[in-house]
From Swiss-Prot:
Encoding gene per record: yxlA
InterPro entries, per database record: Pur-cyt_permease (IPR001248), Pur-cyt_permease_Fcy2/21/22 (IPR026030)
Organism (species): Bacillus subtilis (strain 168)
Keywords: Cell membrane, Membrane, Transmembrane, Transmembrane helix, Transport
Membrane topology: Multi-pass membrane protein
UniProt protein name: Putative purine-cytosine permease YxlA
Family designation: Belongs to the purine-cytosine permease (2.A.39) family.
Length: 457
């Protein structure tokens, strides 16, 4: 296995390979781990019964995956990482604003997945949790060095092996006793249901900043519809499956979230070592995703200032740097995981949703997929240093979300007025979409008209 040569630059046609169907196992495997499963416990932890928890999981996944897969479809056409493409909206320097937020997301998910894996490992092997975190992080660091192709291969292996093992786990979990009436709809607590849908949708949206990184090597003529549907199907099927198991386990085992990995491994009795291997492999596989994304974002952030040439040595140093930061976060967060994880999920949604709205409106409705890829690497090019229209729309959208926020550390006044319902995600989608389209479309038309006049002289 060779170390990946490319980083944030355009992938030339002669290096393109693979088919759209290869994306199904990538995104199916990306969710076949216990962090996804723990996300499925959130609706139950909020107070919904099993029926409404499953409904929230299905609704949130199917809605969130639309945005995730729409980003994936950009990869083959542009041949660059997702966050480089953000320079077309924010400007070459301005894109650093969402990049910082995205790096926080990668490292946050790295920490949460590492904590879960370390807790599971330490339950079966006499190793302190902190040393488990350090050891697992080291393995992820080594795997991330190889890059794109190894990640694809790991996800294919994980897809098949985890399918077989979690199929058996599903049979065992459905045999566990659950409280009477858990599947009866009953009255819906709409505010809590909306919060749960938002949390689940955020799981899918969290893939948006790097989903195109794994489709950018596909041939440029790959149909966008195939890229979309293979990504959508892969992530939706596995997410709903894992989150359903999480909701069932929380309903059956009230203390499940105290050590989720250990409890699901113990279901296999004398064959628990098989499940232990799958759990650890799944956590490491998704953490390679997270480290790769953090590395790409770091490179994208530094490139306008340093004009980096990412040699193998530079690559290793940068990946080591993000691994160390993620490891420190894991060590600091292991004592109060569930509360931190829940707040983290909600926190990132308030920033991710406006970004994804702007990016998709620009790609599909403003520029219609037509970009000057070389110009995205030129600070003095047509995309400029900072696009103030985008920056203002992005920041204003976040500010307008605040009154609608409902978290454990802050409840906005309008969220209280609506009985605790968190509709900040609706504001985060609608406001930047309208603002960006209304302000940016005329500006581009005016620029195009001016260029036509120049060319006719």
């Amino acid at each position: 296995m060779k170390v990946e040569r490319r980083t944030i630059e355009y992938i030339p046609n002669e290096e393109r390979h693979g088919k759209a169907k290869d994306l199904f196992p990538v995104w199916f495997g990306a969710n076949m781990h216990i962090t996804t499963l723990v996300t499925g416990t959130i609706p139950v932890a909020m107070g919904l019964n099993l029926f409404w928890s499953v409904a929230a999981i299905i609704c949130g996944t199917l809605i969130g995956a639309i945005f995730m897969a729409s980003h994936s479809a950009q990869g083959p056409q542009l041949g660059i990482p997702q966050m480089i493409q953000s320079r077309a909206q924010f400007g070459v320097i301005g894109a650093i604003l969402p990049l910082f937020l995205v790096m926080f997301i990668y490292l946050g998910f790295f920490a949460s997945s590492t904590i879960l894996a370390a807790g599971t490992l330490s339950s079966f092997v006499p190793i302190p949790g902190s040393w488990s975190i350090i050891g697992l992080s080291a393995v992820c660091f080594l795997l991330t060095i190889f890059g794109h192709d190894l990640i694809h291969k790991m996800q294919k292996i994980l897809s098949w092996t985890s399918f077989a093992v979690f199929f058996a786990a599903t049979i065992l979990i459905f045999q566990l006793p659950i409280p009477a009436g858990s599947w009866i709809p009953g009255a819906i607590d709409l505010p809590i249901f909306l919060v749960a849908v938002s949390a689940v949708a955020t799981w899918q949206l969290a893939y948006a900043p790097y989903v195109a990184d794994y489709s950018r090597y596909l041939p440029v003529k790959t149909p966008a519809s195939k890229t979309f549907w293979y990504s959508y199907a892969g992530t939706s099927v596995s997410s709903i499956w894992m989150m359903l198991l999480g909701a069932l386990l929380t309903t059956s085992l009230p203390d499940f979230t105290a050590n989720s990995g250990s409890q699901i491994v113990q279901l296999f009795g004398p064959f628990s070592f098989i499940m232990l291997i799958i759990v650890l492999f799944g956590q490491m596989a998704i953490n390679v995703f997270n480290l790769y994304g953090a590395f790409m974002s770091t490179t994208t952030t530094l490139e306008p200032f340093l004009k980096l040439k990412v040699t193998p040595k530079v690559r290793i140093i940068m990946i080591l740097g993000v691994t160390l930061v993620g490891t420190v976060l894991s060590l600091l967060g292991q004592s109060n995981f569930m509360e931190l994880f829940l707040n983290f999920i909600f926190f990132i949604s308030y920033f991710l949703i406006p970004w994804t709205a702007i990016n998709l409106v620009d790609y599909y409705f403003v520029r219609h997929g037509k970009y000057q890829v070389k110009a995205m690497f030129d600070v003095n090019g047509p995309y400029g240093k900072v696009n103030w229209i985008t920056t203002i729309a992005f920041v204003l959208s976040i500010l307008l979300e605040i009154p609608f926020i409902n978290t454990s550390f802050y409840i906005g006044p309008l969220a209280k007025m609506f009985g605790g319902g968190d509709i900040a995600w609706i504001i985060g989608l609608a406001v930047p979409s309208v603002l960006y389209y209304v302000l940016m479309k005329p500006r581009l038309k005016k620029r195009a008209g001016y260029q036509e006049k120049l060319s006719s002289l």
